[in-house]
Design a protein with these regions (language model features):
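Short, small-residue-biased leader/transition segments that mark boundaries at the very start
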Residues: 1-5
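Glycine-rich phosphate-binding loop signature in dinucleotide/nucleotide-binding domains
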Residues: 20-26
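Glycine/threonine-rich flexible loop motifs
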Residues: 37-46
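Short, glycine-/small-residue-rich phosphate/pyrophosphate-handling segment
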Residues: 63-90
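A charged, well-structured terminal subsegment
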Residues: 84-112
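C-terminal accessory domains and tails appended to enzymatic cores
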Residues: 96, 106-191
């Protein structure tokens, strides 16, 4: 389409699916390549993954791709091999309904990547601090900084995979409900 839409990534998927491509079958939504990791807790803040999840909500196969490099001029050529392989598998073998794949590609040369790992999301957090700064006009703003802390010591998660030079694939779903939390509330709250 010749129209340009400037919206949030999930909104772009909705506009494409229900307006631009409304009479067409969509084989796959590929979102990204994001500059920076969307592994572990970072998936919650990700526009790239929100677009993929939006597709999955409507049972359209969807994948969010991220390169673990925040440099806007990052070298992307080595990602082609993995994007092609993953997309080919998704088209030929499918993705379960309501599931989006979260793919993170290490920022290393193709020769150093050991392969692809299917894994789960790591249990990690950001311990944030905020720097108070001033823009050129003297206005205050805050810049979030902090340390990424991986509490997950398993070898079956995305953080381990990326750290050990693997491309990680985590199947993600929209439902963030906690069965354990719901059970606790049902047993202990008097509402």
């Amino acid at each position: 389409a010749s129209d340009v839409y400037k919206r949030q990534p999930a909104d772009c998927v909705k506009i494409a699916k229900h307006h631009i491509l409304k009479n067409r079958n969509i084989d796959l939504i590929a979102s990204g390549i994001n500059h920076g990791s969307n592994s572990s807790i970072s998936v919650l803040y990700s526009g790239t993954m929100s677009a993929a999840i939006e597709g999955a909500i409507e049972n359209t196969p969807a994948i969010g791709f991220s390169l673990c490099d925040f440099d806007p001029n990052a070298y992307l050529d080595h990602t082609k091999e993995y994007v092609k392989k993953i997309v080919k598998n998704a088209l030929e073998n499918g993705i379960p309904d309501s599931i989006a794949l979260n793919v993170n590609i290490p920022a290393i040369s193709s020769e150093k990547i050991k392969g692809i790992k299917l894994c789960r999301q790591a249990n990690a957090i950001w311990e944030e601090t905020f720097d108070k700064r001033h823009d050129p006009y003297g206005r205050e703003y805050y810049w979030m900084v902090g340390n990424f802390v991986n509490h997950d010591k398993g070898k079956d998660n995305d953080e381990w995979a990326i750290k050990n030079n693997y491309v990680s694939i985590v199947p993600c779903k929209f439902d963030l409900s906690s069965k354990r939390g719901l059970s606790f509330l049902n047993d202990n709250w008097k509402i």
